[in-house]
């Protein structure tokens, strides 16, 4: 399931983040690459753990914590501290799949990457190219979103970033370990949660059907989740 989350950051928050990022020192993006990705990747990245990465990453994690749609879709157990990349002058990232396990450098913190996320930090009219292209059984889905919007998708997906031919594409990317590791089970819970919320808005939270479906949701979550 690929999901577009609108307005994870406000335009003001994006501007504040960009002020920090644009003043930071960037390095070769292959510092976080596995062997396969290193052969496919051409971009720049903020050093993990740098002051700029921590400051903007904290702002993103705070915003995610206030976003009920993100929680419903991801059911997050752990979130890898956000990383940041920059594409310009023909930079791109050929087709690859993300590593299954991500470990924070110099620490014991590691996660299973169930979901990948890209939060766009440049408006699409400021650059050309740079589409995030995600493959699944239904074809290729392309994301080139307004600044502050985020795309969430299974980390098992083949994906690539098309070359940026004009301007600069800046984004944050990170991974989520979900309480529910199976993509199909997680998608079922997300759909059920949306249906319950919609029915509750129509009939009230005390309606018998709403109460029953809420119970089914939590019992499925209890069956499938690792917390």
Curated annotation (Swiss-Prot):
InterPro entries per record: Oxoglu/Fe-dep_dioxygenase_dom, PKHD_C, PKHD_hydroxylase, Pro_4_hyd_alph, Pro_4_hyd_alph_FE2OG_OXY
Keyword Ligase: no
Cofactor section: Fe(2+); L-ascorbate
SMART domains, per the entry: P4Hc (SM00702)
Domain (Fe2OG dioxygenase): residue spans on this chain: 78-178
Comment on bound cofactor: Binds 1 Fe(2+) ion per subunit.
Pfam families named in the record: 2OG-FeII_Oxy_3, PKHD_C
Binding residues annotated for 2-oxoglutarate, in chain numbering: 169
EC identifiers of the protein: 1.14.11.-
Binding site for Fe cation: 96, 98, 159
Swiss-Prot/TrEMBL GO biological process terms: DNA damage response; intracellular iron ion homeostasis
SUPFAM superfamilies (UniProt xref): Clavaminate synthase-like (SSF51197)
Molecular function (Gene Ontology), one example: 2-oxoglutarate-dependent dioxygenase activity
Keywords (A to Z) from UniProt: Dioxygenase, Iron, Metal-binding, Oxidoreductase, Vitamin C
Protein name (database record): PKHD-type hydroxylase Bxeno_B2194
Organism (species): Paraburkholderia xenovorans (strain LB400)
Organism classification: Bacteria, Pseudomonadati, Pseudomonadota, Betaproteobacteria, Burkholderiales
